[in-house]
Regions:
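Type III/flagellar secretion export determinants
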Residues: 1-108
Length: 108
């Protein structure tokens, strides 16, 4: 429910804890998957030959000066020189979150 989301979280100003609560809420409601939640929480997968490495990546709160909406818009607009299924998946996830955040902002 967008009205609930808009009343609980400000898309243009979220602390780290608020962002994590927001992402967890989306997962708990089935809006995003566990894998999508991990990605939004900053977990990234990098391949090196046959091995997979996971590492923490700064979230929109750290990069976007707490303006999650603007940072996710930026993420959704990226054009990768070497597109992969994973980078396109991340970009599409960002677009999905942008649409949620924009609707929240309209209802504030």
């Amino acid at each position: 429910d967008y009205d609930y989301l808009a009343s609980e979280w400000d898309p243009t100003h979220m602390s780290r804890d608020e962002y994590k609560e927001f992402v967890s809420y989306l997962r708990d409601k089935g809006i995003i998957s566990d894998e999508e939640k991990r990605y939004l929480d900053g977990e990234r997968i990098a391949t090196s030959g046959q091995s997979w490495v996971s590492f923490d990546y700064p979230t929109p709160v750290e990069y976007g000066d707490e303006n999650v909406l603007e940072y996710m818009r930026y993420e959704a607009s990226l054009v990768y020189e070497h597109r992969t299924t994973y980078t396109e998946w991340g970009k599409n996830l960002s677009k999905k979150i942008v649409s949620i955040l924009e609707e929240m902002e309209r209802r504030r």
